[in-house]
Amino acid sequence: QEEALKLYDAGADIYLITNFSSPIYVTERKEIERGPEHYQMSMAERERFRNLEWEMQKYPQIQSLKEANLLLGTRRTFGIYQIKDDSPGENYAFMNMSFIESHGMQIKKEDYKLVYVGELLGNTSLDDIFERFNIDRPKDFRGHSLSVSDIVVLNDGEKVTAHFVDSISFEQLDSFLNL
């Protein structure tokens, strides 16, 4: 169960093994928490996560399998980073890029924590993500409303980019990921 939860939290497709003739796809974490003792995933999915675990060793700045799936995976995903409590980033929390630059501060990934990863559907834009995480936040989102100084990472399946939420737009941050 612990392994299934770890992989589910990282974004893996997990199936419950029950008395039914075919496995049941897991759509919520609590299904694993209260579900049967047996789980399965496709061989391709298992191999994908084994490769991500191996790739993580090359990048010590990647803190979790969930983050590795976002930054190194080949699926279309997006992630939201918010400033960690008690980090130097608190000095520029909720401040715009102009303020940060004029005060000689630098945006550093180590000041942030990954608070959400989701599927990047169709032609979803940064503005769409901003609207969703301010008006109709997903139930499993545990951060504050998407705000100035947050970072949105987009993985289109081929390229990964980081974007600073500024006062009225988004600014691409090539230095944030440093992969």
Describe every region a protein language model picked out.
Residues 83-88, 96, 110-116, 168, ...:
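Short linear regulatory motifs enriched in tryptophan with gly/pro/ser
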Residues 88, 105-107, 158, 171:
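Catalytic phosphate/metal-binding cores of nucleic-acid and nucleotide-processing enzymes, i.e., regions
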Residues 71-74, 107, 147, 158:
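A generic structural signal for short, non-catalytic loop/turn and secondary-structure boundary residues
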Residues 1-100:
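N-terminal intrinsically disordered, low-complexity, charge/repeat-rich segments that act as generic
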Residues 34, 107-151:
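Short, conserved turn/kink motifs that form compact alpha/beta structural patches or helix kinks used as
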Residues 73-83, 114, 126, 162-163, ...:
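Broad hydrophobic/π-residue packing in well-ordered secondary structure
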Residues 142-177:
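Short, compact, well-ordered microdomains
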